[in-house]
Amino acid sequence: MITAANLHRSYSIGKKSIEILHGVDLHIAAGEKVFLCGPSGAGKTTLMYTLAGLETPQEGKVAIDGTDIYALSATARSVFRNRNMGFIFQNYLLMPELTALENACLASSIGRRPRVEYVTELMERVGLSHRLNHLPSELSGGEQQRVAIARALANDAPIIFADEPTGNLDRKNGAEVLDLLFGLAAESRKTLVIVTHDEHLARRGDRIITIMDGQAV
């Protein structure tokens, strides 16, 4: 469960201060698939980063399963984030010198099963068992995003944050990637928080939160 109360976030540009988030309140239940939508520059990504503990608000509170993440030290917050969150980004962020499997292993932690064994299983689930030893440059955009999905799921975190995960893909590949993410997340009832400008894709979630004029509406 994610709860945000009275979030304010602003940036300084020259001598001007521009407020991106203006008193945002929201509640996301465990297992929900929520899309953050709104026009360019509305603050969708800023809100996601603030909910994830990556950008500190000037005012307000974010609680995840009752833990006030901004009351934690920076080190404790990083540990909490690594245990509880996975991330998928529009530009994949794969290390060019590492294989697909090695990239997918980067965010994982040793759990009940050996790490490489578990991640290899995830790579099979995302349809890349034949591409484990390929470099990112040898993969299509859709395949690279599948690696990113496996990486986000590798530490078995209960929350997945995704920033425009289909933004660099065509409509068909984007829908396939979203289907894959939804299916894998549903198996362990993960919470999905997805930033998108594509309202067609957003309609497939449980709920759409629109960011307008710095507020969630």
Describe the function of each predicted region:
Residues 98-106:
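Short coil-to-helix segment of the ABC ATPase nucleotide-binding domain corresponding to the Q-loop/switch region
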Residues 135-145:
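Conserved ABC ATPase signature
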Residues 160-163:
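Catalytic Walker B motif of ABC-type/P-loop ATPase nucleotide-binding domains
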